[in-house]
Amino acid sequence: MTMSFAANRARGEIRVRYEKHGGITRPLRLFETGGLRLRHPRAFQGCVGMIVNSAGGIAGGDHLRLAIEAEEQSELVIATPAAEKIYRARDKAAMLDLSLVLAPETKLAFLPQETILFDGAALSRRLDVTMANDASLLLVETLVLGRLAHGESAISCDFRDSWRIRRGGRLVFAEESRIEGPLNRTFDQPSLGHGRRAMAFLLAVAPDAEARLESLRARLAPFEPACPHGVSAWNGMLVARLMAASPEVLRCALLAGLGLWRDDIARLWL
Protein backbone atom coordinates (compact mmCIF):
# COMPACT_ATOMS: atom_id res chain seq x y z
CA MET A 1 0.00 0.00 0.00
CA THR A 2 1.33 3.41 -0.99
CA MET A 3 0.64 6.36 1.29
CA SER A 4 1.33 10.02 0.66
CA PHE A 5 1.24 12.89 3.11
CA ALA A 6 0.64 16.54 2.36
CA ALA A 7 3.50 18.80 3.35
CA ASN A 8 2.92 20.87 6.46
CA ARG A 9 2.13 24.48 5.59
CA ALA A 10 2.94 27.20 8.09
CA ARG A 11 0.34 29.84 8.90
CA GLY A 12 1.39 32.84 10.92
CA GLU A 13 -0.09 36.24 11.67
CA ILE A 14 0.72 39.36 13.65
CA ARG A 15 -1.79 42.16 14.22
CA VAL A 16 -0.62 45.06 16.35
CA ARG A 17 -1.77 48.58 17.12
CA TYR A 18 0.51 51.19 18.65
CA GLU A 19 -0.42 54.33 20.56
CA LYS A 20 1.51 57.24 22.03
CA HIS A 21 0.66 58.04 25.63
CA GLY A 22 2.59 60.36 27.91
CA GLY A 23 5.23 60.84 25.22
CA ILE A 24 5.91 57.09 24.95
CA THR A 25 4.88 54.82 22.06
CA ARG A 26 3.82 51.34 23.09
CA PRO A 27 1.73 48.46 21.72
CA LEU A 28 -1.93 48.91 22.64
CA ARG A 29 -3.19 45.61 21.20
CA LEU A 30 -1.22 42.62 19.96
CA PHE A 31 -2.38 39.37 18.37
CA GLU A 32 0.05 36.60 17.42
CA THR A 33 -0.54 33.18 15.95
CA GLY A 34 1.49 30.41 14.33
CA GLY A 35 5.24 30.83 14.24
CA LEU A 36 5.26 34.64 14.15
CA ARG A 37 6.07 36.66 17.26
CA LEU A 38 6.64 40.35 17.92
CA ARG A 39 9.07 41.31 20.66
CA HIS A 40 9.98 44.74 22.04
CA PRO A 41 13.54 44.66 23.45
CA ARG A 42 14.35 47.36 25.98
CA ALA A 43 17.93 47.77 24.78
CA PHE A 44 16.95 50.28 22.09
CA GLN A 45 15.94 53.90 22.33
CA GLY A 46 12.25 54.45 21.66
CA CYS A 47 9.74 51.83 20.57
CA VAL A 48 11.33 49.01 18.55
CA GLY A 49 9.43 45.90 17.51
CA MET A 50 11.29 42.79 16.35
CA ILE A 51 9.43 40.33 14.13
CA VAL A 52 10.55 36.77 14.90
CA ASN A 53 9.75 33.82 12.63
CA SER A 54 10.29 30.81 14.87
CA ALA A 55 10.19 28.49 11.85
CA GLY A 56 13.58 29.82 10.78
CA GLY A 57 12.46 30.48 7.21
CA ILE A 58 9.58 30.37 4.73
CA ALA A 59 8.79 27.34 2.58
CA GLY A 60 6.45 26.78 -0.36
CA GLY A 61 2.78 27.00 0.62
CA ASP A 62 3.41 28.98 3.81
CA HIS A 63 1.20 32.04 4.34
CA LEU A 64 2.27 34.84 6.68
CA ARG A 65 0.36 38.04 7.46
CA LEU A 66 1.56 41.20 9.20
CA ALA A 67 -0.79 44.08 10.02
CA ILE A 68 0.72 47.09 11.79
CA GLU A 69 -1.34 50.12 12.77
CA ALA A 70 0.15 53.25 14.34
CA GLU A 71 -2.16 55.73 16.02
CA GLU A 72 -1.70 59.50 15.96
CA GLN A 73 1.83 60.80 16.73
CA SER A 74 3.24 57.32 17.31
CA GLU A 75 6.96 56.85 16.62
CA LEU A 76 8.27 53.32 16.11
CA VAL A 77 10.68 51.04 14.30
CA ILE A 78 9.85 47.53 13.09
CA ALA A 79 12.80 45.27 12.21
CA THR A 80 13.89 41.62 12.15
CA PRO A 81 16.73 40.01 14.14
CA ALA A 82 18.02 38.02 11.14
CA ALA A 83 17.71 37.57 7.40
CA GLU A 84 14.58 35.78 6.17
CA LYS A 85 15.30 32.63 4.18
CA ILE A 86 12.94 31.53 1.39
CA TYR A 87 13.40 27.80 0.81
CA ARG A 88 12.80 25.72 -2.30
CA ALA A 89 9.10 25.29 -3.10
CA ARG A 90 7.89 21.85 -4.15
CA ASP A 91 4.57 23.06 -5.56
CA LYS A 92 2.81 26.17 -4.22
CA ALA A 93 4.48 29.54 -3.71
CA ALA A 94 4.80 31.02 -0.24
CA MET A 95 2.70 34.12 0.44
CA LEU A 96 3.57 37.14 2.58
CA ASP A 97 1.04 39.95 3.12
CA LEU A 98 2.05 43.16 4.87
CA SER A 99 -0.31 45.99 5.80
CA LEU A 100 0.81 49.30 7.35
CA VAL A 101 -1.60 51.99 8.56
CA LEU A 102 -0.16 55.35 9.65
CA ALA A 103 -2.36 57.92 11.39
CA PRO A 104 -1.61 61.69 11.30
CA GLU A 105 1.87 62.75 12.49
CA THR A 106 2.99 59.12 12.79
CA LYS A 107 6.61 58.14 12.13
CA LEU A 108 7.17 54.50 11.18
CA ALA A 109 10.40 52.87 10.00
CA PHE A 110 10.06 49.35 8.60
CA LEU A 111 13.61 47.97 8.38
CA PRO A 112 13.78 44.19 7.94
CA GLN A 113 17.08 42.48 7.21
CA GLU A 114 17.77 40.70 3.92
CA THR A 115 15.40 38.29 2.18
CA ILE A 116 17.48 35.41 0.76
CA LEU A 117 15.98 33.41 -2.10
CA PHE A 118 17.26 29.83 -2.23
CA ASP A 119 17.41 27.89 -5.49
CA GLY A 120 13.86 26.90 -6.43
CA ALA A 121 12.24 29.42 -4.09
CA ALA A 122 8.76 30.73 -4.91
CA LEU A 123 7.38 33.76 -3.06
CA SER A 124 4.46 36.10 -3.68
CA ARG A 125 4.66 39.21 -1.51
CA ARG A 126 2.23 42.09 -1.16
CA LEU A 127 2.65 45.43 0.63
CA ASP A 128 -0.26 47.81 1.25
CA VAL A 129 0.31 51.13 3.00
CA THR A 130 -2.37 53.61 4.03
CA MET A 131 -1.00 56.81 5.55
CA ALA A 132 -2.06 60.33 6.44
CA ASN A 133 -0.67 63.29 4.51
CA ASP A 134 1.59 64.37 7.37
CA ALA A 135 2.73 60.87 8.39
CA SER A 136 6.30 59.69 7.72
CA LEU A 137 7.32 56.27 6.42
CA LEU A 138 10.83 54.88 5.98
CA LEU A 139 11.01 51.48 4.33
CA VAL A 140 13.88 49.24 3.22
CA GLU A 141 13.79 45.95 1.34
CA THR A 142 16.92 43.94 0.53
CA LEU A 143 16.87 40.91 -1.77
CA VAL A 144 19.72 38.40 -2.14
CA LEU A 145 19.47 35.96 -5.05
CA GLY A 146 21.00 32.71 -3.87
CA ARG A 147 23.19 31.70 -0.94
CA LEU A 148 26.19 33.64 -2.16
CA ALA A 149 28.38 32.58 0.77
CA HIS A 150 27.97 28.99 -0.50
CA GLY A 151 28.78 29.98 -4.06
CA GLU A 152 25.15 29.57 -5.09
CA SER A 153 24.63 32.16 -7.82
CA ALA A 154 23.14 30.26 -10.79
CA ILE A 155 19.72 29.75 -9.28
CA SER A 156 16.17 29.61 -10.56
CA CYS A 157 13.24 31.10 -8.65
CA ASP A 158 9.81 32.70 -8.93
CA PHE A 159 9.50 35.96 -6.98
CA ARG A 160 6.56 38.34 -7.25
CA ASP A 161 6.32 41.64 -5.41
CA SER A 162 3.36 44.04 -5.35
CA TRP A 163 3.50 47.44 -3.61
CA ARG A 164 0.72 49.99 -3.12
CA ILE A 165 1.08 53.16 -1.04
CA ARG A 166 -1.84 55.52 -0.46
CA ARG A 167 -1.36 58.90 1.18
CA GLY A 168 -4.28 61.08 2.09
CA GLY A 169 -6.61 58.70 0.27
CA ARG A 170 -4.67 58.91 -3.03
CA LEU A 171 -2.48 56.26 -4.63
CA VAL A 172 1.02 57.79 -4.73
CA PHE A 173 3.22 54.75 -5.37
CA ALA A 174 2.57 51.45 -7.15
CA GLU A 175 5.06 48.86 -8.32
CA GLU A 176 4.83 45.32 -9.66
CA SER A 177 8.01 43.23 -9.84
CA ARG A 178 8.67 39.67 -10.97
CA ILE A 179 11.86 37.65 -11.11
CA GLU A 180 11.53 34.17 -12.57
CA GLY A 181 13.48 31.41 -14.25
CA PRO A 182 17.27 30.92 -14.35
CA LEU A 183 18.65 34.17 -12.97
CA ASN A 184 22.09 33.95 -14.55
CA ARG A 185 20.50 34.55 -17.95
CA THR A 186 19.10 37.85 -16.71
CA PHE A 187 21.35 39.26 -14.03
CA ASP A 188 24.62 38.51 -15.80
CA GLN A 189 23.68 40.94 -18.59
CA PRO A 190 25.62 44.23 -18.36
CA SER A 191 22.45 46.28 -18.76
CA LEU A 192 20.83 44.59 -15.76
CA GLY A 193 22.75 43.02 -12.92
CA HIS A 194 26.19 42.56 -14.50
CA GLY A 195 26.69 39.57 -12.20
CA ARG A 196 25.40 41.29 -9.08
CA ARG A 197 23.05 39.23 -6.94
CA ALA A 198 22.22 41.58 -4.04
CA MET A 199 19.86 44.52 -4.42
CA ALA A 200 18.07 46.94 -2.15
CA PHE A 201 15.21 49.41 -2.33
CA LEU A 202 14.94 52.36 0.06
CA LEU A 203 11.77 54.44 0.16
CA ALA A 204 10.92 57.46 2.30
CA VAL A 205 7.46 59.03 2.14
CA ALA A 206 7.35 62.10 4.35
CA PRO A 207 6.87 65.88 4.30
CA ASP A 208 10.67 66.34 4.36
CA ALA A 209 11.58 63.44 2.04
CA GLU A 210 12.55 65.50 -1.01
CA ALA A 211 14.76 67.78 1.08
CA ARG A 212 17.00 64.80 1.92
CA LEU A 213 17.84 64.00 -1.72
CA GLU A 214 21.33 65.51 -1.94
CA SER A 215 22.31 64.31 1.53
CA LEU A 216 21.41 60.72 0.64
CA ARG A 217 23.34 60.93 -2.63
CA ALA A 218 26.38 62.20 -0.74
CA ARG A 219 26.19 59.33 1.75
CA LEU A 220 25.99 56.67 -0.97
CA ALA A 221 28.57 58.16 -3.36
CA PRO A 222 31.66 56.65 -1.61
CA PHE A 223 30.37 53.13 -2.34
CA GLU A 224 30.64 53.49 -6.10
CA PRO A 225 31.57 51.50 -8.19
CA ALA A 226 31.18 48.45 -5.92
CA CYS A 227 27.59 49.44 -5.18
CA PRO A 228 26.02 51.29 -8.13
CA HIS A 229 22.83 53.10 -7.21
CA GLY A 230 20.28 55.67 -8.26
CA VAL A 231 18.47 58.19 -6.07
CA SER A 232 15.50 60.36 -7.00
CA ALA A 233 12.80 62.39 -5.26
CA TRP A 234 9.37 63.63 -6.26
CA ASN A 235 5.91 64.24 -4.83
CA GLY A 236 7.02 63.96 -1.21
CA MET A 237 8.92 60.72 -1.79
CA LEU A 238 12.60 59.75 -1.84
CA VAL A 239 13.62 56.54 -3.61
CA ALA A 240 17.00 54.80 -3.83
CA ARG A 241 17.86 51.55 -5.62
CA LEU A 242 21.18 49.81 -5.02
CA MET A 243 22.98 46.71 -6.30
CA ALA A 244 26.17 44.91 -5.30
CA ALA A 245 27.94 41.63 -5.88
CA SER A 246 28.24 41.13 -2.13
CA PRO A 247 25.47 41.46 0.48
CA GLU A 248 28.09 42.79 2.90
CA VAL A 249 28.96 45.70 0.60
CA LEU A 250 25.28 46.40 0.06
CA ARG A 251 24.60 46.41 3.78
CA CYS A 252 27.43 48.89 4.41
CA ALA A 253 25.97 51.24 1.82
CA LEU A 254 22.49 50.89 3.30
CA LEU A 255 23.73 51.60 6.81
CA ALA A 256 25.39 54.77 5.56
CA GLY A 257 22.21 55.87 3.81
CA LEU A 258 19.89 55.01 6.68
CA GLY A 259 22.14 56.98 9.01
CA LEU A 260 20.45 60.03 7.54
CA TRP A 261 17.41 59.07 9.62
CA ARG A 262 18.75 56.95 12.49
CA ASP A 263 22.23 56.32 13.88
CA ASP A 264 21.42 52.99 15.57
CA ILE A 265 20.56 50.84 12.53
CA ALA A 266 23.76 48.80 12.88
CA ARG A 267 22.66 47.73 16.39
CA LEU A 268 19.23 46.76 15.08
CA TRP A 269 20.82 44.51 12.47
CA LEU A 270 23.44 42.81 14.66
Swiss-Prot record:
Keyword annotations of the record = Chaperone, Cytoplasm, Nickel insertion
Name one matching Pfam family: UreD
* Localization per record: Cytoplasm
- What superkingdom does the record give? Bacteria
A GO MF label: nickel cation binding
Q: Which InterPro entries match?
A: UreD
GO CC field? cytoplasm
**Protein family according to the UniProt entry:** Belongs to the UreD family.
How does this polypeptide assemble, per the annotation? UreD, UreF and UreG form a complex that acts as a GTP-hydrolysis-dependent molecular chaperone, activating the urease apoprotein by helping to assemble the nickel containing metallocenter of UreC. The UreE protein probably delivers the nickel.
- Annotated function: Required for maturation of urease via the functional incorporation of the urease nickel metallocenter.
The name under which this protein is listed is Urease accessory protein UreD
| Provenance organism | Beijerinckia indica subsp. indica (strain ATCC 9039 / DSM 1715 / NCIMB 8712)
Upper classification of the organism: Bacteria, Pseudomonadati, Pseudomonadota, Alphaproteobacteria, Hyphomicrobiales
